[in-house]
Amino acid sequence: MPITPYTGPFGRPELQHLLRRSLFGCTTADRAHFEGMSLDQVVNELLTFTNDTTPPVRAYTDENGDPNGIDAAVPFGSTWVDTPITPLNDTDVIEVRIRSFAAWWMGLMRGQQRNLREKLTLFWHNHLPTQVSIVYQSEMQYRQNQLLRSGCKGNFKQLIHDVSVEPAMLFYLNGYLNVAAAPDENYARELFELFTLGQGSGYTEADVQAAARVLTGWTFMVENGGTPVLPQTLFFPPNHTASDKQFSAFFNNTVIQGQTGPDAGETELNALLDMILAVPECSRFICRELYRFFVHGEISAEAEAEVIGPLAQLFRENVDAPDQIAIVLRALLTSDHFFSNAIRGCMVKNPVDLVVGDLRLFDFPIPDPGLVEARYLVDLEHYWLTAYAGMNLMAPPNVAGWPAYYLYPSYDELWLDTATYPQRNNSLLAVVYGSVETPSNTVQPGSADLAFRVDIIAFVQQLSDPADPNALITDLVDLLYVNPISDAVKLQLKHFYLLFGQVSDIYWTEAYEAYIADPNTTNMTAQLVPDILRWLIGDMQKAAERHLY
């Protein structure tokens, strides 16, 4: 039975719900871009993208501001991704390149195109994670990130195949140590338990051992004859177990025929993945993962039957399709279930959605593209702001990713508690109140002594009628909260912040219009307008509702 498509109204509430789950936040510009389109048209555009990113560039210096004091092999303003670190263990260069990668990734999310690429890249990073503390190699981190964003909406078998032999994953889960003489079960176990089938799905310990033997012989190279090279995947036939591999009844008693020669690893890996994908539990597991990321952590019995089951069937029917994940996501995001009232506002935002969504919503200014040094500094500040809020992107807690996407029964509620709320709240306030400043001793003269801060007046001027305090409050509620708030709370916000304790709306209207007419006005009340707006929005940011989507 196919999943039930949504046939109800597709107005602003439905559009904002879809965009909040598909993008990092929903800005007034996002909303204006899609308004008037049908649901199918919006989802088609969200799923239409390529990996057209440009690589990170060297915009860093040593601790003294000297561009030649570190990573001198890479010219300032050029990319480092195609230059091996020499020597390999130069931790100073590794650190600055990792920070460059972090800033680059943050910049892509902050400046995301209006499609699902960045959200899906985060999804797969959580599902197929590596930790920078273990894979302490910037080129490997960059390569895997590019692999995820290139394959994020494509064919699942191809993606899991590519990740399995990617140097970052070979290193992270000991694949490079998995040899015929001493099989290492680490990756095989996680392949079954975390990446394709799920714990307790029915595979046996003997299946893990057999899969480990299938995967023997894969390794990677980061130096050649003592000279550092870019990470390269290799298959070394002498280290591969050439005997047959027997699997249990869970896998229909499949026997993967042992292979020899240079193609043995590729042949057996594909046979292993075909065997896994033939098990119905694989399709259900992946669809549950997508559901928990885009819809809700807890999956009810009804959702399992009416959503997961049909999506899994669609997944299996398109097992060879190059856009398999896009097909499944399109069905999910256009389903009746996705737009049900119970799903709207039911999830706690992860810290990336929270912080990047606010940076986008308030249009935090960023330096011109040519000012690579200033842009790097701003993006890196925002990367650490996201980490402060609770999600250091390069440091998922373990190979299972973040607990909010797998830990029953709390799931996304784990993001928000008495310990995390102050940090999350401070991060939101930092976006509205804070500024990022660049130092005087930059390499690029144009990157020196700059300050970037949200233009709160420019933000409210995007709203329907910011001079009308009632319209202003209504528009802010619509943008900041998924669910409406009471008229009494709206009235309280209006009187406390906009009317200065007065009764008539004219007090705000006159002050706002006076400031807009002349930002240098001598009207003392009008001079306070930008501060009043920050106070108002800052107070609205503190509400628990701000953390839901």
Spans of model-derived segments:
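Active-site substrate-binding loop specific to GH73 endo-beta-N-acetylglucosaminidase modules
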Residues: 1, 72-88, 98-105, 137-377, ...
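Eukaryotic PEST-like, Ser/Thr/Pro-rich intrinsically disordered regions enriched for SP/TP/PP repeats
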Residues: 1-2, 14, 40, 52
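Flexible, low-complexity segments enriched for small/polar residues
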Residues: 2-27, 279, 283, 287-320, ...
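Hydrophobic/aromatic residues in well-formed alpha-helices
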Residues: 15, 31, 39-42, 208, ...
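N-terminal accessory alpha/beta regions
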Residues: 28-149, 497, 503-518, 524
